[in-house]
Amino acid sequence: MNHTMRPFLFIAMACAVAWAASARAQVPQSGPSFHEAVGMAWAIDPVRIELQVGHHSARARVSAAGSWFAGGPTLSGEYMDDHMLGSNEGYTTYQGGVSVPLWLPGQGSATQQVASAEAASLDEQLNVEHMALSIRVLDAAAASLIARTRVDVAHTLYDAMARMAASATHAVHGGELASTDGQMAQAAMENAHNELALAQEEAENAAASLEALLGRPVVPDLARYGEGDVTHARFIAPRDMEDNDPRIKVAHRNVEAAEANMKLARRSFMPNPEIGVDAIHEKQYGSPWDDRVGLNFSIPLPSEVRNTPIMSEARNRLASATSQETQARRMVHLEMMRVRERLIAATTVRQATRTAADSMERRAAAQEHAWRVGEAGLDTVIAARQAAGGTRMASARADVEWHVASIRMLIATGIVP
């Protein structure tokens, strides 16, 4: 039994050395700041490109709405003679004209107001996307840091289990320990090895997700943000924070655009009239060619069949925009409360878990020492080491979540630190 365990122990220790080298190789350098990371993600964000194209299009509509006429010119032409089907007396007429649609009273300025309001809404949508992207980067960075911490904790536990397994194997070989205790130590080491493999997988997945956002294999340094960065945020009134939120701003811009559209619908109470110039060139029987020039106009009359759907659509748009603004204010208000409470809770949890982690680590060290001098059982030591690893992981997670809550508080105030 002792001879079969010795080669297995050597293999396990070799694996531990290999895992240690891998972990050291993966220790990140000092990463970019969170602000720089958001800039990396913003530079390659496809939604940003889409919104910017829409923004340029909206500005083009604003410029086009300043035209003198409500549309492009219309060309018309006619040709008539009596050669084929008529009396064949030599009558020939050429007639052509050009006309343009005119704005109704106030319709041109109302059209410009609608285009300007929609362009302003797209500006705020860019800010909303930037805020949403900042939160996605923050969550991905936190997940990556927590995953790396899990690797460190799992590696520390594996080293401790491997060390205890080596001691147990030596004791079993010397007849100082029962073989069942040696098997228990080997099983604990294998469990720690399995946890390390799972932690490595989680870290790789989290790093891949973050790299997809940033375009680079880097992890932003969140630890530099903390108490000092959110001091001024505590003195900002919740109402001011809500009004400064881009989601409320874009909802308000949409209401303004809907109101401008309602005004435009009222101004468009009839189809646009047209005015133009006509020219006639004709030849009559026994007479020389005759040329004439005149004006033409066309005035379609108002109709409920046309106007009712236009007004109904404008009213529906305004009602929907107003409802969405109210819902956005409620959602942002609740989120602000959650962000504040989360920061308070994260601060408390961070302090508590840090103290617990220190205490459990000292307890595990004391239990291992007691086991080596024969004053404690192996199962007690293994349980103490596992508990110490769990509290250390909880402490590290709480520390990352505290930094995340601090940054999230800054984002809520409109600042990307």
Roles of regions detected by a PLM:
Residues N2-H3, E129-N244, V339-A346, A366, ...:
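Periplasmic alpha-helical coiled-coil/stalk elements that build and connect Gram-negative outer-membrane
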Residues H3-R6, F10, R24-V27, A394-P417:
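Acidic, low-complexity, intrinsically disordered peripheral segments
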Residues F10-A18:
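Bacterial N-terminal signal peptides
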Residues A23-S76, P101-W103, A110, A141, ...:
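Bacterial Sec-pathway N-terminal export signals of envelope proteins
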Residues S30-F34, G71-E129, K249-E256, N261, ...:
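Small/polar-residue-enriched beta-strand and adjacent coil segments characteristic
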Residues V38, R48-A65, E129, L133-Y158, ...:
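Amphipathic alpha-helical coiled-coil segments
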Residues G86, T92-T93, Q183, N194-A197, ...:
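Outer-membrane beta-barrel domain signature
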